[in-house]
Amino acid sequence: MEFVTLTEEEFREFSMKHPMANFMQTTDLGDLKSNNGIKIDYVGVKEKGKLLCATLLEEEPSILGKKVFYAPRGFLIDYHNKELLKFFTDNLKTYIKKRKGFKLTIDPNLVYQVRGADGSIMPKSQKDDESFKNLCDLGFEHFGFNLYLEARQVRFAYRMMLDEPYDVKKQEFSKSTRKNLESTYKKGLSVRKGVEKDLPIMEDLFKDTATRKDFFYRKLDYYKEMYKYMKDLMTIYFAYLDPKKYLECAKENLKEEQEKNKEIVNKMEKDMIGAKLKSQKEASDKRLIKLENELKEAEEFKKNYPEGKDIACLLSMWNGEEFLTLTSGSLEKYRKFTPKYAMYDAHIKDAYKNGYKACNFYGISGNFEKENNPLYGVYEFKRGFGGNVIEYIGEFTLPITKFNKFYNFLRGIKRMIKK
């Protein structure tokens, strides 16, 4: 076996076809990072000319002229092949040491175990303890089985396997999810795909959500660069409110309820008014008031936005055999349209169309209790589409030199001072 540096072309060909392929281990992301001043390396192991494993490495400057190295969602390797893993790790240590690096961090795109939809450990689920042990035996230090967002990458995600036709899978959506989808489309909402000129709209929607929820968000320049280098991996969805369609749906919905209300009145005139009929009339009257107000809102919307308006956005990514929902944003004012459901539905349909094996709805927390859990709503929404919780193996750090201990000592002092 031979440890080698790789050209972008060699790495691209290998990484796009690997079983653990993901968007973080692509030359597309490497080019984006390079453009932002981060040194990118591509290395691997060959035997008789055949590439056996590889990884993208980020070089990050640290203190005193030293560097730390990071392989985001790497390596692309069979973690059960201990001989190959050891050879690669040993040579990486030498490679990194020569470049003044003192530690390497990895967070493999490796599922540690599949859990039930409710987060419970399933009886037949097997933990990938072999991969975990192989890494630890080689000196990798595990960050821990964290439940939240303490590490660089998410450790829990929600995944929907596309092993049955869409119409069958849709029956596995929760009742509330199916109801919200139906309601969303009945309100005149549609989904369109974005292009480069739509990036300012996307940034505004992400900013609105991030500001509302006190999240970090990236500026427009970042998304322009991201689109430049990663557009072949990206799909941008917009939930679009068309004024004409919105108004037509509002009129139709009101008309349907008026007819239902009239039928109830006719029954009340012919029959004795029972509690059930009276309750139906009261509920219908309330819906009529609501729908009349919605019609006024639709008329006002058409007046203010004759060209329509994008009210939500979803950014999805190629992730090997998965189609991944990376991030989303929406306008609070139009929350009642539940636009996220329509965008996720479009994402799922495209995943089927393009031959993906799964939809990865990405980050959730590992706390599945509703009480005192601010992230529960994210999990509950994604769970509504059916599927399972997946638990990644987590983050590992490999100390390269003794300087790592000194570095950790300084960080400890810094944390103490902050307290």
Predicted regions and their residues:
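Short secondary-structure boundary/hinge segments and terminal tails
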Residues: 114, 152-153, 202, 369, ...
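Residue-level detector of family-conserved "landmark" positions at structurally sensitive sites
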Residues: 106, 145, 194, 220, ...
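Short amphipathic alpha-helical segments
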Residues: 67-73, 156, 187-189
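Acyl-donor binding region in acyl/amide transferases
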Residues: 66-150, 309-311, 317-385
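C-terminal catalytic domain of photolyase/cryptochrome flavoproteins
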Residues: 12, 42, 302-303, 364-419
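A conserved beta-strand-loop-helix scaffold within acyl/acetyltransferase catalytic domains
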Residues: 3-48, 52-64, 113, 139-151, ...
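Alpha-helical structural motif
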Residues: 7-10, 88, 127, 131, ...
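A short, hydrophobic/aromatic-rich structural module that often spans a beta strand
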Residues: 119-130, 151-169, 332, 401-419
